[in-house]
Regions:
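Phosphate-binding site recognition
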Residues: 1-246
């Protein structure tokens, strides 16, 4: 199906002024897409670093009424609302030469529309390739807060052969934090993504079904919010009781 679509695009290029294609991986080197071999990869170009998200300036210019409404609904100040949105949905960087912060547009728009902080991006559907890397994540989950990847690997077309770091970067779970020479430092862009990844791997870490974990999490949050520390510890012990020691 993809080959046919891209073959049509190439055959009719005289009628096309601009074509923008986005996804989680660069595919110009993959034989399946050889029918469309005249692409320009703009993934890391500084002039396009903010093309797929929402910037601080765009929030100020376009979303202040929605931000103010969200502040009123939740009893927050305007600054508190902005800071919470930034913590949850901001933090993406797409070019070492233009490290402008970019918000996840899907999550930000949904949050402002509903006046709630929720994991909107995660609930839109986790990638089916994620379980392939569960074993690596069990051992190195905390390392993804700050991990490194070589420059010529980060743009590799085969995400399944580049390790968990490459896949998590290209699928949006990690972003560029800084660059030193030929090494990219990657990390979680924001709180929404951090929580989403941890929830994805929690069933494997605890050897429990997702439904069981959600029930125990709800109990844990309720006890913590009410200050019932002993009850919270009982739930926590139950949650991790079957987990491996290593």
């Amino acid at each position: 199906v993809y080959r046919e679509v891209f073959a049509i695009l190439k055959a009719n290029d005289e009628y096309e002024k601009l074509v923008f294609i986005t996804g989680i991986t660069k595919f110009t080197q993959i034989s399946l897409f050889s029918a469309l071999n005249n692409l320009t990869n703009i993934s890391f170009l500084p002039e396009y670093a903010t093309i797929c998200g929402i910037t601080e300036q765009e929030i100020t210019s376009n979303f202040m009424p929605e931000l103010q409404r969200m502040a009123e609904v939740n009893g927050w100040t305007g600054k508190e609302t902005h800071d919470r949105l930034k913590e949850y949905y901001d933090g993406y960087h797409f070019s070492e030469d233009n490290m402008a912060d970019v918000y996840n547009p899907y999550s930000l728009v949904n949050s402002l529309n509903q006046s709630r902080l929720r994991n909107y991006w995660a609930s839109s559907g986790a990638t089916t390739l994620l379980p392939k890397f569960i074993d690596d994540m069990e051992i190195h989950l905390a390392d993804f807060e700050d991990c490194m990847i070589i420059r010529n690997v980060i743009g590799t077309s085969d995400v399944t052969a580049g390790g968990a770091e490459l896949f998590l970067y290209q699928s949006g779970y990690l972003t560029i934090k800084s660059v030193e020479g030929n090494v990219y430092h990657l990390g979680f862009p924001n709180e929404e993504v951090r929580q989403a990844l941890y929830e994805c791997v929690l069933p494997a870490l605890t050897l429990r079904k997702s439904g069981d974990i959600q029930s125990l999490q709800a109990q844990l949050y309720a006890h913590m919010d009410a200050g019932r520390l002993e009850d919270a510890m009982k739930v926590l012990k139950s949650l991790i009781a079957d987990g491996p020691y290593s």
